[in-house]
């Protein structure tokens, strides 16, 4: 039996966290290639450390995209985050580009040829989740953890809070009663800051950001509000800790509330089902909930390399469904082509829309006019309802 009264915690990290710097650089490279060729192939991994950026991976795209353009793209991504520190500066960091051609063995399994449809770029399992806890149909703990850091970043970029530096983390513990979120029992925020800021002043600046995003009455007790528990946090970002692409997959998704298949998103073009099928799974789960068919929904898809159709479709409505799970499984298969090509075309993923996804979650975002966050639309809800009837 599912528990109804409990505490649950999720964390987020800011755009300036070392791993998120790498995610952003990798996704900026994906956008660089897709802007030049919507069918380019990209698998770009990034490492950052003190004044050093290394990009490695496999690509297939226009020859006009030179190492110099990739380097410029990496620097611009770091500049946009705001790193102009002695140990990590967008202008002075050494950038090494080690991208090379995609393996022909992999390409032959993915490419469409003759009457053979495009296959998945790899095997794997992908999960999507949605629930009615928030207006964007995301779990509350990760939703508020993201919003705290996003507000702090907005205040830093606008100049309202020049005391903040780019690197930060948050953690929110939510109290549930009868299965519903009713308040926050603790908040942890660790943020890099200017050297001349006292911890007392920093605490009040962070308090303002937290209060601005939590519902009235949800701010935790003072003794459960933690700001930089270890003290000063002046040295941060890649100068303080090395970063790698794909190290924050739980932050990127549901904050631990739902299963994860293990595949990271950033640095991958949409032929990679690690990314595209995870987006499709979220899209399907969100539309099931938006259709009023359930209060909670988990969708799993699985694939084999070189095979176009999913090997399995699984649905769990967590005891909140108005229909049976197998009805959902049959309906989603009829309402959406879940081949890699079908997903890309339905969600229009062959666009340069990925750099913006690299921080504050890939899910629970607002669909944008240029196709960004298309997997957050609820335009399949009516079709699903009609199919089940």
Swiss-Prot record:
Pathway: Amino-acid biosynthesis; S-adenosyl-L-methionine biosynthesis; S-adenosyl-L-methionine from L-methionine: step 1/1. Mg(2+) binds at residue 19. It comes from Parvibaculum lavamentivorans (strain DS-1 / DSM 13023 / NCIMB 13966). One of its GO terms (cellular component) is cytoplasm. Pfam families: S-AdoMet_synt_C, S-AdoMet_synt_M, S-AdoMet_synt_N. L-methionine binds at residues 58, 102, 241, 272. It catalyses: L-methionine + ATP + H2O = S-adenosyl-L-methionine + phosphate + diphosphate. K(+) binds at residue 45. It is found in: Cytoplasm. It is an enzyme of class 2 (transferase). Homotetramer; dimer of dimers. Its EC number is 2.5.1.6. One of its GO terms (molecular function) is magnesium ion binding. The keyword Protease does not apply. Residues 102-112 are annotated as: Flexible loop. NCBIfam families: metK. ATP binds at residues 17, 167-169, 241, 247-248, 264, 268. This is S-adenosylmethionine synthase. Binds 2 divalent ions per subunit. Binds 1 potassium ion per subunit. Keywords: ATP-binding, Cytoplasm, Magnesium, Metal-binding, Nucleotide-binding, One-carbon metabolism, Potassium, Transferase. One of its GO terms (biological process) is S-adenosylmethionine biosynthetic process. Catalyzes the formation of S-adenosylmethionine (AdoMet) from methionine and ATP. The overall synthetic reaction is composed of two sequential steps, AdoMet formation and the subsequent tripolyphosphate hydrolysis which occurs prior to release of AdoMet from the enzyme. Belongs to the AdoMet synthase family. Its cofactor is Mg(2+); K(+).
């Amino acid at each position: 039996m599912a528990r109804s009264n409990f505490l649950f915690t999720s964390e987020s990290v800011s755009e300036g966290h070392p791993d998120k710097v790498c995610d952003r650089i990798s996704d900026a490279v994906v956008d660089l290639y897709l802007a030049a060729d919507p069918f380019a192939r990209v698998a770009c991994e990034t490492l950052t450390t003190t004044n050093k950026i290394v990009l490695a991976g496999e690509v297939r795209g226009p020859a006009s995209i030179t190492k110099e353009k990739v380097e410029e793209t990496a620097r611009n991504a770091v500049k946009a985050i705001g790193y102009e520190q002695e140990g990590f500066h967008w202008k002075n960091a050494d950038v090494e580009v080690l991208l090379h051609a995609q393996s022909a063995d992999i390409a032959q399994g993915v490419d469409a040829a003759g009457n053979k449809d495009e296959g998945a770029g790899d095997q794997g399992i992908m999960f999507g989740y949605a629930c009615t806890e928030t207006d964007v149909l995301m779990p509350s703990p990760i939703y508020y953890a993201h919003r705290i850091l996003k507000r702090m970043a907005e205040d830093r970029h606008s100049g309202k809070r020049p005391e903040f530096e780019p690197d930060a983390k948050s953690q929110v513990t939510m109290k549930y009663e009868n299965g519903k979120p009713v308040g926050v029992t603790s908040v942890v925020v660790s943020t890099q800051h200017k050297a001349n800021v006292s911890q007392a002043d920093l605490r009040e600046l962070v308090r303002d950001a937290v209060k601005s995003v939590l519902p009235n009455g949800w701010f935790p007790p003072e003794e459960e509000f933690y700001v930089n528990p270890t003290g000063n946090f002046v040295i941060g970002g890649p100068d303080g800790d090395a970063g790698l692409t794909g190290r924050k997959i739980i932050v990127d998704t549901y904050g631990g509330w739902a299963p994860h298949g293990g595949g990271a998103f950033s640095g991958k073009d949409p032929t990679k089902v690690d990314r595209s099928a995870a987006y499709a799974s979220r899209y399907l789960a969100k539309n099931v909930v938006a259709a009023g068919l359930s209060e909670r929904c988990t969708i799993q898809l699985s694939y084999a390399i070189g095979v176009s159709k999913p090997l399995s479709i699984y649905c769990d409505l967590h005891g909140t469904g108005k229909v049976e799970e197998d009805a959902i499984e049959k309906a989603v298969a009829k309402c959406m082509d879940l081949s890699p090509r079908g997903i890309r075309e339905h969600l229009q993923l062959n666009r340069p829309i990925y750099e913006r996804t690299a921080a504050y979650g890939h899910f629970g975002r607002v669909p944008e006019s240029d196709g960004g966050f298309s997997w957050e639309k609820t335009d399949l809800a009516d079709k699903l309802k009609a199919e089940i009837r």
